[in-house]
């Protein structure tokens, strides 16, 4: 069975950026030693590289959205705990998805089945260190025990410093629409000839195929499922506002959870961003900093140019943003890459969003 209909490429934002930690303790891992707070790490060869999970990073985005004044979905006390699953009212349910398989909001089983599970609009990697862990530990004491007449409880916390990398893909086509917004599902359509389906109302179909007839498996008939109808999807203006809110939360990203004990800055210091069609991860593995000039924090324009050429048919627009107080000013006179200061780069991305949502 194959889809023979016309495919429309998804449009989205692909963003890879670097964070600089002077000293910090990313999301915690499992420890077999009492009173030792360890960092999550992944091993390559003989070296361990600290990271913060993508779940922790999405939590930080949620908390930042809340700090920017957006209404966040409350937690429902069930097993397992979940959000209320209302993407119309709550921006995080729209952007980060939810699973509410037993939803009975509309009373129509087929619609509730699709609306009960929403795939995340935002795909995100963990925040991964570019340098290995060097066994640095901070020592402290829990002085609360003194108030109870006991002794201070000593503890240790693994700490790290260096450059970290994270990547996101934001499916702009699905913000404010799709699962969670569905109000009607048309019945499947059949025809004696698949060509009848292809030449009639093609844009209304989600899937078109040739399938065996129930009574005679040797006889093929046309079969089509209609696109699910979202009559209560958000307006283009509201969809733009949510995309812009997510962009702002990246720009002002603040830590959550245990990282509140270590005041760190998770905002982009060097960023490669692209408005893409289909190419979701053009810079995910690209070394944005030039390894040959690590002490100077030089942008690796050659690597970015290579990714740009590799995904040329999937990248519609590209911008590189940098913090001039941390990254050496690049020489782009003879380079076709659009390099801007960080604020200007985010303004450029905002222009892409306005164009996408026709604002």
Residue ranges and their predicted role:
Residues 1-359:
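RNA-binding basic/glycine-rich loop and surface signature characteristic of RAMP-family CRISPR effectors
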């Amino acid at each position: 069975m194959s889809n023979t209909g016309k495919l429309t490429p998804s449009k989205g934002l692909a963003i890879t950026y670097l964070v600089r930690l002077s000293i910090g303790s990313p999301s915690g891992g499992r420890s077999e030693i009492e009173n030792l707070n360890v960092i999550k790490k992944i091993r390559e060869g003989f070296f361990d590289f600290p990271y913060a999970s993508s779940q922790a990073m999405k939590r930080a985005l949620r908390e930042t959205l809340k700090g920017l004044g957006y209404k966040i979905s409350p937690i429902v006390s069930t097993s397992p705990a979940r959000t209320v699953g209302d993407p119309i009212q709550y921006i995080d349910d729209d952007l980060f998805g939810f699973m509410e398989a037993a939803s009975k909001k509309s009373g129509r089983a087929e619609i509730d089945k699709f609306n009960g599970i929403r795939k995340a609009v935002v795909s995100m990697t963990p925040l991964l260190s570019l340098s290995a862990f060097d066994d640095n530990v901070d020592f402290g004491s829990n002085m609360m025990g003194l108030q109870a007449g006991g002794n201070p409880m000593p503890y240790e916390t693994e700490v790290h410093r260096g450059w970290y990398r994270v990547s996101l893909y934001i499916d702009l086509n699905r913000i404010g629409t799709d699962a969670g917004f569905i109000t009607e599902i048309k019945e499947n359509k059949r025809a004696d000839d698949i060509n009848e389906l292809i030449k009639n109302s093609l844009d209304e179909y989600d899937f078109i195929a040739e399938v065996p007839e129930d009574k005679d498996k040797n006889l093929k008939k046309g079969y089509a499922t209609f696109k699910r109808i979202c009559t209560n999807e958000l307006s283009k203006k509201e969809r733009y506002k949510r995309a812009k809110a997510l962009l702002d939360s990246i720009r002002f990203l603040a830590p959550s959870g245990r990282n509140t004990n270590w005041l760190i800055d998770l905002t982009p210091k060097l960023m490669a961003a692209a408005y893409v069609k289909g190419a979701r991860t053009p810079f995910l593995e690209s070394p944005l900093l030039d390894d040959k000039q690590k002490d100077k924090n030089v942008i690796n324009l050659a690597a970015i140019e290579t990714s740009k050429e590799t995904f040329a048919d999937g990248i519609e627009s590209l911008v590189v943003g940098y913090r001039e107080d941390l990254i050496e000013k690049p020489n782009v006179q003879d380079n076709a890459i659009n390099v801007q200061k960080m604020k200007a780069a985010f303004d450029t991305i905002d222009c892409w969003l306005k164009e996408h949502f026709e604002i």
